[in-house]
Every structure is written in C-alpha cells, then in structure tokens.
Amino acid sequence: FILLGLLISNLESFSSTERTNINKFIFKEGDNTSQNNIVLIELRGPILNKPSGAIEFSLIDNIEVIYVSEFVKDLEEIKLQNPKGIVISIDSPGGSVSATYNLYNAIEKFKINNKTKIFLHTDELLASGGYWAALSSDKIYASYGAMIGSIGVRGPDWIYYDNPISISTGILGQTIETKDGIKKYNTIAGRSKDLFNSFRMPTKKEVESLQ
C-alpha cells in the first residue's frame, strides 16, 4: 500500500483557479510503486459552508476553518486517485447546522458512490457538529484524552421577571426589582445541553460524569 497526503492550502488567500494548481498529493509512506492508494485528509477548525469575503479582512483570517464547498472539490480530486480507503484526521468544535449536514452528506455520498471505506481519527476535539459529521464514516478512532461527543442544539435564553415592582436605570445599567424573583428558561435540544447553568442544580449523573 501507499499512503498519500492531500495538501490543502489557505483557502482565503487564493481563487478557485489558483487553488487547483496548489493542491496536490504527496507521498507519505509505503511502497511508492503500489497502485493500492490510501488517502489521508487533515481537517481543522469550525465547519462552515464556504469562505466569506468578510472573513479575509477580519482579525480571525488566520484561523483554520473547514469549508464544506472546498472539501467537496477535494473529494473530486481524491476520486481520480481511486483510493482503496480514506483516513480523515479531524479536530473540530462543530459548526453551523447546514454546513455540518452538508459535510456529513458529502462523506456519506462519496463512500457509497465510490464503494470506498472511510475511517476517521481525532487527536484532540470532536464535538457537536464535528461528531455529527464523523458519524458518516465507517469507523471513528480517537487518541487518548480526546474530547468526544456533545451533540445538541441551543437557542437563546429567556429571562422572565416574575411580578416586577420597580424598574430603574442608572450609570450601571438597568435594574429590575421583582416580587417573586427571576426565572431563566433555556431553549435546548438534548440532555444536559445547559450544563453549568447557574439557575439550576446539577443532576447526580452530570456530577458523576464531570468527576
């Protein structure tokens, strides 16, 4: 077997035409005369659908990002190599719902249409949408100490002032005095997605998991 690595350039810095000339496969290890190729892809950062021009001029333009639109182009290049298998090395905290959904489908579609085994490995972080996308692979491997899981959706919090009796403003901001206290409602989908919420007691299972 021969292990090939796909070099992925800084996507914000190049147009799609320039990017095609820069991306290439490099020999990693194995028998370089073999036709049995295994491709290694490295993905790092949050998951977004495509690059935004606004990001290029922001303070975060050097942060690594997984762009699904560019990943799909990479898969087209990989298909030409006719690999026996693909290893995706990923570290991601998650991303937008639509981008994560598209990444999952891109991997799943490639795997089925090309009858290619896809294995996924993480060294440090595979959380939220990152783990969701990883479920499209045939098997997930994790290094010791890697943070895995935590899939869920959280919306904005709803603060309710129960029976307010005084509202005032000042140099320190607005203050509200209530007769029956303040209640906070969390919009979440999934168990314990409001972990460390100061407005509720932790469950016994949550404490045991953290310990």
Please tell me what each predicted stretch does.
Residues 1-116, 128-132, 136-211:
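Small-residue-centered hinge/linker elements
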Residues 119-127:
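Glycine-rich beta-to-alpha transition loops that act as phosphate-gripper elements at the mouths
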